Amino acid sequence: MKGFKIPEATISRLSVYSRYLENLYRKGITTVSSADIAQGVGVTSAQVRKDLAYFGEFGTRGVGYNVKELLDHTLKILGLNNTWNMVVVGAGNLGSALCAYRGFRERGFYIVGVFDNDLTKIGKKINEYEVLPIDKLEEVVRENNVEIGIIAVPAAYAQDVATRLVKAGVKGILNFAPTVLNVPDKVIVRSVDLTVNLEVLTFNIRRD
């Protein structure tokens, strides 16, 4: 897989496939076809087969896929056969909502620290997490082998936070601030701009 680039859309769909397979596994279903997966997640069966083909050969023609085996493969490909420690920087409304989201743990992502520079927030609890001063960020990242940092601060502060996260040793950043971050090539950044997603919706609504 390191020899060529996997399309990001394929990775996104693989995540959706894994959730669908988890649901089948919980129901006790042991085999599934590409057509079943396609119908369950809203793509074509050809797309399912093409996406899976990036990572090897799965299933048996005329029989389909073993649900447990394919689930295990997809989780391993996505890195979800391990657990991941994360920190959240920003204890405002968005940061609080992220701390309350139970889906992280269900997929192996664990928040080990929440940070802010607002003295009125430091020391208070968001769910089970005590808000820590931003000066403790590097210490917590290093002591807990944190590889993922989530930025939930205003755009004006996002670059400073990203720089501190990189210096502390994180390998990936999920950025909710509406700004472009400047980080080394070795650090992976995924930005979630809610306004951009809304604008994509309005474009498609108008076009229809």
From Swiss-Prot:
Gene3D superfamilies for the chain: NAD(P)-binding Rossmann-like Domain (3.40.50.720), Winged helix-like DNA-binding domain superfamily/Winged helix DNA-binding domain (1.10.10.10)
Molecular function via GO: DNA binding; DNA-binding transcription factor activity
One GO BP: response to redox state
Protein name: Redox-sensing transcriptional repressor Rex
NCBIfam families per record: PRK05472.1-3 (NF003989), PRK05472.2-1 (NF003992), PRK05472.2-2 (NF003993), PRK05472.2-3 (NF003994), PRK05472.2-4 (NF003995), PRK05472.2-5 (NF003996)
Record family assignment: Belongs to the transcriptional regulatory Rex family.
UniProt-listed SUPFAM superfamilies: NAD(P)-binding Rossmann-fold domains, Winged helix' DNA-binding domain
Pfam families from the UniProt entry: CoA_binding, Put_DNA-bind_N
Keyword Heme: no
Residues where NAD(+) binds: 90-95
Assembly with partners or alone: Homodimer.
Keyword entries, A-Z: Cytoplasm, DNA-binding, NAD, Repressor, Transcription, Transcription regulation
GO annotation, cellular component aspect: cytoplasm
Record feature DNA-binding region, as residue ranges: 16-55
HAMAP family cross-referenced by the UniProt entry: Rex
Compartments in which it is found: Cytoplasm
Its job: Modulates transcription in response to changes in cellular NADH/NAD(+) redox state.
Organism: Carboxydothermus hydrogenoformans (strain ATCC BAA-161 / DSM 6008 / Z-2901)
InterPro entries tied to this protein: CoA-bd, NAD(P)-bd_dom_sf, Rex_DNA-bd_C_dom, Tscrpt_rep_Rex, WH-like_DNA-bd_sf, WH_DNA-bd_sf
